A protein has these predicted regions:
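Short alpha-helical DNA-recognition segment
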Residues: 20-37
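DNA major-groove recognition helix of helix-turn-helix/homeodomain DNA-binding modules
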Residues: 49-65
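A short, Lys/Arg-rich alpha-helix, primarily the initiator
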Residues: 1-17
Length: 75
């Protein structure tokens, strides 16, 4: 199981690889940009499953991929 910091890193790397800004992803996922920022930086104690699934959907990622791959292997 990955930590929130590791999950946040995966999300940030994928977002950057797609050339998307935090505000764009957050808006499409229906969450505040500040919430996504805190998640990507590992500065949140919790990030609900609905939020996570919404963000992953925007980025074209699936939960099983994120949970079984390390943050360094997004290619």
């Amino acid at each position: 199981m990955q930590t929130l910091l590791e999950l946040g890193n995966v999300v940030a790397q994928k977002r950057r690889a797609l050339g998307l800004k935090q505000g764009e992803v957050a808006n499409r996922a229906g969450i505040p940009q500040a919430t996504l920022s805190r998640f990507e930086l590992g500065k949140t104690a919790e990030f609900g499953s609905r939020k996570l699934l919404a963000v992953l959907s925007v980025l074209g990622l699936e939960i099983d991929y994120v949970l079984t791959n390390s943050a360094g292997s997004l290619d």
